[in-house]
Regions:
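ALDH superfamily catalytic-core signature
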Residues: 1-119, 141-143, 147
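Conserved glycine-rich beta-strand-loop-beta hairpin in the small C-terminal domain of fold type I
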Residues: 68-69, 106-110, 126-132, 151-155
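Short, conserved active-site loop motifs that form the nucleotide-linked donor/cofactor pocket
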Residues: 94, 132-133
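Cytochrome P450 core scaffold surrounding the K-helix E-X-X-R motif
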Residues: 120-125
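Short acidic-hydrophobic, aromatic-tinged amphipathic segments that line or gate anion-handling sites
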Residues: 135-139
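Conserved SAM-binding loop
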Residues: 159
Length: 170
C-alpha cells in the first residue's frame, strides 16, 4: 500500500507524468504500485486536478490494442472489491475525481482517483490492488512521514522533492 509523498518544491508536471502511468500499470495490480498520495497542502488541488486530467486519458482495453493503456483486473472478484472500497471512501467524504465505476465488460474497473480520502476509509488502510489512487493533503514533513508510516506494512514508498534538505530528512 505504497505511500507517495509529494512536496511543494517538486516539479509538479514531471511528477504527475511519472506517477500516473505507474499507478495504472497492470491496472494497479503490482505489489509496489503507488497508491496513497500525500500531497503538500499548497499544491494539493493542482496535483489532484492534474492527476484527474491524466487519469481521464488512460484508456482501457485489450492488451494487444495499441490504444489501450490499462487492461482488466485479475479475476471476477476484483471489480466488486474495488467498487466496495470506492463506495466506502465516498460515503466517508472522499471526492471521486475520475473513474469510480466498473467497466462495461469483463473484469475492467475505470482508472480512478479519489481526493480528500479520510484515514477512516477502508481503502486508506487496506491495499486495493487495483486501479484506484487515493489522495490526501499534508502540512509538514513530520505530518507526511507520520501518514506514510501509519500502516504496519509496505513494500515501497516514493517521494518527490527538489529540495536536498527535504530528501535528506526523509
Amino acid at each position: 500500500h505504497a505511500p507517495v509523498l509529494v512536496f511543494d518544491d517538486c516539479d509538479l508536471e514531471r511528477t504527475l507524468d511519472m506517477v500516473v502511468p505507474q499507478k495504472f500499470r497492470n491496472a494497479g495490480q503490482v505489489c509496489v504500485s503507488p497508491t496513497r498520495f500525500y500531497v503538500q497542502e499548497s499544491i494539493y488541488q493542482r496535483f489532484v486536478d492534474g492527476f484527474a486530467a491524466r487519469t481521464h486519458g488512460v484508456t482501457t482495453g485489450h492488451g494487444l490494442d495499441a490504444e489501450s493503456k490499462m487492461g482488466p483486473l485479475a479475476n471476477l472478484r476484483r471489480p466488486a472489491a474495488i467498487e466496495a472500497l470506492v463506495e466506502d471512501a465516498a460515503a466517508k467524504g472522499a471526492r471521486v475525481m475520475a473513474g469510480g465505476k466498473r467497466g462495461n465488460a469483463g473484469y475492467f474497473f475505470q482508472p480512478t482517483l479519489l481526493a480528500d480520502v479520510p484515514d477512516s476509509a477502508e481503502i486508506m488502510n487496506n491495499e486495493p490492488f487495483g486501479p484506484v489512487a487515493v489522495a490526501a493533503p499534508f502540512s509538514t514533513l513530520e505530518d507526511a512521514v507520520a501518514k506514510a508510516n501509519r500502516l504496519p506494512y509496505g513494500l515501497a514508498a516514493f517521494a518527490f522533492t527538489e529540495g536536498l534538505r527535504t530528501a535528506n530528512l526523509l
